[in-house]
Amino acid sequence: MLNKDFDVLKNWMFGSLSSLLDDIPPNPNLNILKMSIGEPQLGPPKFIRSQFDNFFEDWGKYPSSEPIPVLKDAIRDYLNKRFPGSKKIINFDKNLLPVPGTREALHLIGLISKNVQKKNSIAVLTNPFYHAWKAGAIESGSKILWLNAEESNNYNPNIDDLSKETLERTSIMYLCFPTNPQGALTDIDYFIKAINLAKKYDFILAIDECYIDIYRTSFSKPIGCLDALIKMNENLNNIVIFNSLSKRSNVPGLRAGFILGDENVISLYKLLVSNGASPVPIPVQNIAASLYKDENHNYETCLYYDQNFKIAKEFLKESHPNLKIPDAGFYLWLPVNDDLKVTIDLWKDYSVRVMPGTFMAENVSGQNPCKGFLRIALVHKKEIVKEAMQRISNYFKNNYV
């Protein structure tokens, strides 16, 4: 009765972490510090509080799949400021659609990419992966081809080695920049290469840019796929870009973002929403518009994460003297000798819950690209981050990394 294709989704990182730790009691003398999940803790910007009352009546209206005018204008202004020149290549009536966060959209885009003309189709996925990409690949009916994102290639999946036969069978390719969880960036040339492949071999290039506005303030803002398209003076054919407010504006519960891309894909996605997926409520669209209009709160958020990474580097300077602070994102990607053992020890002895890298990626040719790393979410207030880093530092003083 049930679709067995989805059995593989039961094996996901948080379920695996629960299986690893739930039967092990934490240290009863220490409060639990949950550093395993990337849920922003800074809190929503205060200026949106009143807007929940301002748009109260709109909860009584069915939302359209289309963006309301104020949101469309806000996104247009945001994109043109963030990616100068973008208005030259975007038709905001045909290339843009609001989505209730990007997790659903990343999943459903796989269904849209299903291509019966491509026999034995392939979905190319970055490894480590976000579970919505994997769900989308399953929806596409394709065989998954994993591309490892490793330190040796600056966590940029190697698309150069994809064969002509593989590319001809590809229905969708998922890439994520800045990378998750390592916070690495890419360059214009990489984007241009990926864009050209998508257009030449006619597949959907899905670019997850949910961390595009979480960056270290001492560096330039990360480049995005739009920067490459602008430089190429190319249209959005074969491209879909995913943008979310969850990380940018500390509102993961708002479920607001947008997809920008190929007008044929957007048109089909709109049809899918009209027939059974989720449109974005009108009050949420109004609040999202206010957030996209404001840059100050986003910059303050980036400063907040800058401080947390400085704290981590200071506490870990003895155990990890060459610790690299990521260019973007809010995860510390910490190398260790045995990530599963360290995860258990930190929980059992120090009541700190972290995510072992092993659970975040698939084994490819007998190798897991994330084995030997911990993902530590530096999303909490600095007092909590200090306490967590102190405990982790104490652990490393008494144990081999």
Regions found by a protein language model. Give the residues of each.
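Helix C-cap/helix->beta junction micro-motif
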Residues: 140, 200-201, 319, 350, ...
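Generic structural signal for small/hydrophobic residues in well-ordered secondary structure
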Residues: 17, 35, 52, 75, ...
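N-terminal small-domain helix-loop-helix segment of the aminotransferase-like
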Residues: 5-104, 291-292, 398-401
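Conserved core segment of the aminotransferase class I/II
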Residues: 78-79, 227-306, 310-314, 390, ...
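Conserved core of the PLP fold type I
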Residues: 60-197, 212-214, 218-233, 385
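Conserved glycine-rich beta-strand-loop-beta hairpin in the small C-terminal domain of fold type I
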Residues: 285, 289, 305-313, 322-336, ...
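PLP-dependent enzyme catalytic core of the Aspartate aminotransferase-like
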Residues: 81, 85, 235, 348-353, ...
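A short helix->loop->beta-strand "cap" motif at the edges of active sites that frequently abuts
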Residues: 121, 200-204, 236-237
